[in-house]
Amino acid sequence: MRIAVLANLKINAPRWEGMSEDQWDDLDSPKTIDSIVAALQSGGHEAQFFEANILPPHNLIERLEAYQPDLCFNIAEGHFGNGREAQIPAVLEMLRLPYTGSQVLTLALALDKPLTKRVLLYHGLPT
């Protein structure tokens, strides 16, 4: 199986003056990505890492179309916006590429903690 590993590397994250030191703590390191790719390859799969960014120089959409993965192993966090974790899955759905992890709506909802709490309480789940 041909697998595209999608993530955001901390070293590639945007930076600006005055940003918090822990702004990108949830992003990944090259060591983590190398371990995931190696584990997939040891299982007999072809695996390649792609920076989860549609903008140049990363050009994720064009690179995925060229690679034609059977599956996208998605651990992308995104960089901006309330639904940042849902952005790459939304792109993958538009490209009709299967991916691991939660669906777009679930990821977007989970980042909105007050709305998530209201939905859970509505369904009788304590928070």
Predicted regions and their residues:
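ATP-binding N-terminal substructure of ATP-dependent carboxylate-amine bond-forming enzymes
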Residues: M1-P98, V104-L105, L109-L111, L115, ...
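Basic phosphate/pyrophosphate-binding loop/patch that engages nucleotide-derived ligands
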Residues: V119-T127
